[in-house]
């Protein structure tokens, strides 16, 4: 059985495979196991077990081996969880998030924004200008919006995530 005690690992697995998938992970024995056996011991439908295993495989958190039955010719998939890969998978997720935040930071720094006085939406200067500084949703006026707070928050988040990667 694979115990997932680390709250960060637990949250990550929940994000990937949900509650039932987490139950499947925790029910996995140390040795290889078939998806049918997992469905049997967890009481979770075979389709859900397979979906969860494939999601784990896509994130490199599970591996499988195919074995052909010599009599029937059918393939049997034997699955195994790779809990040692959780940290590297989380690290990859953090790197992706940092890249997205850097792209958002560039966007925020490269544009001037105008916001609807009624809170409908926020527009870049070009869009606001095309609409004569009038909100296309409510016809309210669009006023200049200072985004330095947004920039600071993004920069701080990037700094925190980068520090977490280094530790």
Swiss-Prot record:
SUPFAM superfamilies: Winged helix' DNA-binding domain. Gene3D superfamilies: Winged helix-like DNA-binding domain superfamily/Winged helix DNA-binding domain. It holds the Pfam family TFIIE_alpha. Keywords: DNA-binding, Transcription, Transcription regulation. It comes from the Archaea. Transmembrane segments: none annotated. GO terms for molecular function: DNA binding. GO terms for biological process: regulation of DNA-templated transcription; transcription initiation at RNA polymerase II promoter. The winged helix domain is involved in binding to DNA in the preinitiation complex. Transcription factor that plays a role in the activation of archaeal genes transcribed by RNA polymerase. Facilitates transcription initiation by enhancing TATA-box recognition by TATA-box-binding protein (Tbp), and transcription factor B (Tfb) and RNA polymerase recruitment. Not absolutely required for transcription in vitro, but particularly important in cases where Tbp or Tfb function is not optimal. It dynamically alters the nucleic acid-binding properties of RNA polymerases by stabilizing the initiation complex and destabilizing elongation complexes. NCBIfam families: transcription factor E. Monomer. Interaction with RNA polymerase subunits RpoF and RpoE is necessary for Tfe stimulatory transcription activity. Able to interact with Tbp and RNA polymerase in the absence of DNA promoter. Interacts both with the preinitiation and elongation complexes. This is Transcription factor E. The gene is tfe.
């Amino acid at each position: 059985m694979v115990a997932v005690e680390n709250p960060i690992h637990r949250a990550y697995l929940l994000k990937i495979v949900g509650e039932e998938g987490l139950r499947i992970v925790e029910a996995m024995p140390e040795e290889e196991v078939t998806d049918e056996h997992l469905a049997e011991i967890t009481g979770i439908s075979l389709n859900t077990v397979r979906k969860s295993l494939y999601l784990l495989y896509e994130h490199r958190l599970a591996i499988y081996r195919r074995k052909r039955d010599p009599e029937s010719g059918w393939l049997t998939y034997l699955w195994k969880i790779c809990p040692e890969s959780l940290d590297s998978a989380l690290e990859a997720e953090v790197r992706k998030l940092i890249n997205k935040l850097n792209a958002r930071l560039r966007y925020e720094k490269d544009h001037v924004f105008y916001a609807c006085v009624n809170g409908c939406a926020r527009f870049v200067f070009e869009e606001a200008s095309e609409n004569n500084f009038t909100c296309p949703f409510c016809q309210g006026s669009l006023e200049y919006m200072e985004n330095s707070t947004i920039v600071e928050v993004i920069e701080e988040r990037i700094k925190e995530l980068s520090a977490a990667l280094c530790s």
